[in-house]
Amino acid sequence: MGKVAVAGAVDYSDVSALTSVLESEQVDTVISMLPIDNDESGQAQLNLIEAAEKSTCTKRFLPSEFGMVYTKDPCPFLPMEAQAVDALEKTNLEFSLVSIGLFLDYWAAPRIPTHIRAANIIIDPENNAAVIPGDGNTPVVFTHSPVVFTHSTDTAKYTVALLDIPNWKRRYAIVTNRMTLNEAVKLAEEVKGVKFDVKYLSVEQMRKGENDLTPSMKKALPEEMHSGMKSMLALSGIGMAAGSNDIREIDDLVVKFPNIKPVTVRDVWEAWK
C-alpha cells in the first residue's frame, strides 16, 4: 500500500497548493471525506480531484460518496456526486465508489459515540416514535458512520481494508444491516419492550411537503430550520420509498472482510434500553 492521507486544513480553492501537499506527502491514495452538501463543498472536491490528477505520485481516489447508489436520474438534488464521477472519469486516476446506505449514527447517537452531528431521523428510539416514508416495507441498508484517522467505526474500517485490494472495481458496497423500516421498528419494540408511535407518510404527502420530523429532530433543530429539514427528508424519503436505499448485486466489503465485526441495528437498540 502506498502512503494514504485524508486532507485536513488545506485551501481547497487552490489547486496548485493542493497538488503541492499531495506531492510533498507522497500521497498515493486520496480518500475524500468532505461533507458534500452545497456548491462550495462540491467544487472543493472537484479541485481535489484535479490536484490528484496533476500530482506525480497520486494514483487512486475515493470520492466522498458513502451513501446510497447515487445516479443522475433519481437524485437530481445531489448533482455534486454526479459531477465528481464525471470529473474522475476524465482523469487517469483509479477510482471507486463506496455505497453504504444510511448512517446508523442517526439512530445510535448519542448512546453510541459518533463524530458527526446526528439527531434521530425516521426512527426516534429516545422518544419511542417513528416517521416512516412510504409503507415501511422497502428494504433499507444501514451502516455505522466513518471517523477518519481513528478508524473506530465500520465504514472507516472497511474503507481502509479496501485499500489493500490491488485493482478496484468501479463500485463497492458496505452492507452491514439490510432490513425494512417496519422490521427495524419491530426490533426496537422487541428490544426496548415498548410500543412505538409510528406515523407513515405517503409519497403524495411528501411531494406536497406534508412531511414531519421526529421529536428528537424537532428538539435538536431551531424552529426556523424545521421547514428546510422537512423538505430535505421528503426528497430522500421519496427515493427511499422507491427503494433507492436498497443495495444489492454490488461487491460487498462485509463479505470480503469477515474479520471485521460491524455494529448491528440490534446493538443500537440495546444501547437505548
Where are these regions (language model features)?
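Oxidoreductase cofactor-interface core, primarily capturing Rossmann-like NAD(P)-dependent enzymes
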Residues: M1-K3, G8, V15, M68-D197, ...
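Short beta-strand elements of ligand-binding domains
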Residues: K59-E65
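Terminal hydrophobic/aromatic helix or amphipathic segment near a protein terminus
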Residues: V185-S244
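Short, amphipathic alpha-helical "lid/cap" segments that border enzyme active or binding sites
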Residues: T19, S152-V160, P262-E270
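Amphipathic terminal alpha-helices
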Residues: R248-K273
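NAD(P)H-binding glycine-rich loop region in Rossmannoid oxidoreductase-like domains
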Residues: A9-T58, Y70
